[in-house]
Structure formats: C-alpha cells, structure tokens
C-alpha cells in the first residue's frame, strides 16, 4: 500500500473545528478544506459569517468550500455571491437540489457563467453528475462532490460510479471529481484508485490515517490482543 504522500488524489480536511483546521492547514499533506452546515452546527458555531471570515484570515492559500444554507434559490444566489467575495480561495458549495427536490442546476449554470468557483454537493447519481457537467463553465474551476460513502451505505459499491463520474467530467479540465462522505481510511486509497481528483476526509479519520497507514499487521494484531487484556483486567472480570 502506498504512503499517503505518494497518492495522486488531493486530500482535503472535512470539518469546522477551528483548531483542527489550523493544525491540518500546517500539514503539507492537506491540500484544502471543506465544511458544511451540519459540521458547523456540530462544532457549536452560531455565526456563519464570523466563523468563515475568521478562518479565511488564517487559511489563505488552500481552497476552502463554504456552503450556502438557504432553501430558496434566489437567496442561495445572494448568499453565494456574498461568500464568493470573501476570499480568492473560496469555493461556494451549492446542493444539487433544495429540500423540495427542485434542481439547482439553473443556479449552478448562472453562477458558473458569472465566474463563481463552485462545489456542487450532495450528489449521488450519475444523472446528477451529467447535469452538473452540462451546467458548469469550462473556463471556471469547479468541484463535483459525489457522496461515495452514502452510496456504500446502501450496499452499493461506489467505485464503478466514481470511475464513470470521472469519464463524464473528462471534457471539463477545470472540474474536479471529489469523493465525499469518507467512512474509513481505505476510502482514501479507493478514491485514488478510481482517479478522483480530491477526497475530503473528516478530521478523526485523517488522524487515524496518519497513524495507521502502512502499519505492520502482525503488530496491529498484538496491539489488539493487548487492548483486550487491558480492558478485561480493568473490568475485573472473573469466572
């Protein structure tokens, strides 16, 4: 298995914990950042703009994706243009639909033509990837975030779909396919194997990847046995 530093896929950090983001920003292995409203709420954030502007003061070179949070397309557009103006390294995340399952592609097309760097998110089907590909501006950088982990949650292998998604985007050199919803370290290597440009990884899984990638399995086996023995002794079990 390759070392993380030898992979072709760019590893992004997925989270909204400021301390964690700053620590990971200092790591040359991490090439960018992604956030979303759920992660921000989990981090206890209540002021979207204050958080975003603050983090953009510290992370100035690597791309950061910040997501709109309105469910109305006119307000999504206003938020997108505002977020876009905060820094040159910002990508504006637009969900593939709103909560009424109305397509956001007209908005994506409009913003892309205005030169807004977009991260179109919450994609799970190849039909959605095709729609996004048709809506993007070939001259403007964009990210197409396919939630491979959620596909896998349904019992479906996401690898064929991710490879097909890469082919759909082949005519758009500025559009990058992103493997989202990483569940385990293996997903990072799967994203690399299927040719994704980016994989975005939660902070806790990044920590595990940096610790365990390449670990000798016999040593890991012994560590596991020691863990069981330690916990059994601590519990004071008797027969």
Where are these regions (language model features)?
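Catalytic alpha/beta core domains of metabolic enzymes, predominantly
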Residues: 102, 106-109, 116-207, 213-235
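Active-site beta->alpha loop and helix N-cap motifs at the rims of alpha/beta catalytic domains
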Residues: 2-30, 34-110, 114, 148-151
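Flexible domain-boundary/linker segments
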Residues: 41, 50, 128, 208-209
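C-terminal extensions of enzymes
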Residues: 238-239
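Non-transmembrane, interaction-prone segments in cytosolic or luminal domains
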Residues: 36, 47, 75, 91-92, ...
